[in-house]
Amino acid sequence: MKIKIGKVEKRLNQIIEEEGAVYLTLLDPEEENIEEIAENVKDYADAIMVGGSIGIVNLDETVKKIKKITKLPIILFPGNVDGLSRYADAVFYMSLMNSANTYWVVTAPTLGAITILKYNLEPIPMAYLCIEPAKKTAVGYVGEIREIPQNKPKITAMYCLSAKFFGMRWAYLEAGSGASYPVNNETIALSKKLSGINIIVGGGIRKPEIAYEKVLAGADAIVTGNLLEENPKAVEMMYDAIKKAGKEKLKNK
């Protein structure tokens, strides 16, 4: 079986090439007002991620509800092997590379591989890296992470280079859901420069100006999740900031 890039990933790459950055919104399947949130983001996000670190309830129904509201690609962001749905378009096939538990590094994605094939989901190979202060968030606890310090950008960059050598085309630099502060610019810039793969940044990004500076630092994609639950209307300002920074980044190339 020949490995090839699927249509969702091609679309994301095209947006990055033409607009400089992608805006991904993360929806938690357990949110009661999931339809309202989807309605608020459908005109501004480039794709919708669905997933969470703790528990999955009626994932199929959640994805179907979102599909009725928007034609945006739905990318699964599984917290475990039960975070898969045949109704989604793609899945971030990820390894939590800096977990102390090999289950999260390789066993969980391996156990999910046959289901992904069976469901005909498009796998998007991605390194998932949890960076300070992620240890204080749900993903840090569940994923048993060896947290990468913010003041050691070379460590994150080396993980990204390793991911590239493993054949991964994306790396997600995660500060954690509800993080008190985001991944710093130096870490983003060095990770992008050393690896050259697509860099996603999420966690602790609550203001448009923060998203703007992360894109200029080298982020190819920005993820917001908690922001949508706290202030769904903020998505428009976030989108505008990301696209503005993307254009500037392309101009400066």
Curated annotation (Swiss-Prot):
Chief location category: cytoplasm
Name of the top EC class for this enzyme: transferase
Q: List localization entries.
A: Cytoplasm
The source's superkingdom equals: Archaea
SUPFAM superfamilies, A to Z: FMN-linked oxidoreductases (SSF51395)
Q: Which reaction does it catalyse?
A: sn-glycerol 1-phosphate + (2E,6E,10E)-geranylgeranyl diphosphate = sn-3-O-(geranylgeranyl)glycerol 1-phosphate + diphosphate
What Enzyme Commission number(s) does the record list for this chain? 2.5.1.41
Alphabetized Pfam families for the sequence: PcrB
GO terms for CC? cytoplasm
Q: In which pathway does it act?
A: Membrane lipid metabolism; glycerophospholipid metabolism
Ordered alphabetically, the record's keywords are: Cytoplasm, Lipid biosynthesis, Lipid metabolism, Magnesium, Metal-binding, Phospholipid biosynthesis, Phospholipid metabolism, Transferase
- Its GO biological process terms? glycerophospholipid biosynthetic process
InterPro entries from the xrefs?
Answer: GGGP/HepGP_synthase_sf, GGGP_HepGP_synthase, GGGP_synth, IGPS_HisA/HisF
Q: Which family does it belong to?
A: Belongs to the GGGP/HepGP synthase family. Group II subfamily.
Record's function text? Prenyltransferase that catalyzes the transfer of the geranylgeranyl moiety of geranylgeranyl diphosphate (GGPP) to the C3 hydroxyl of sn-glycerol-1-phosphate (G1P). This reaction is the first ether-bond-formation step in the biosynthesis of archaeal membrane lipids.
For this protein, the record's HAMAP family field holds: GGGP_HepGP_synthase
Instruction: State the name under which the record lists this protein.
Output: Geranylgeranylglyceryl phosphate synthase
Q: Which organism is it from?
A: Methanocaldococcus jannaschii (strain ATCC 43067 / DSM 2661 / JAL-1 / JCM 10045 / NBRC 100440) (Methanococcus jannaschii)
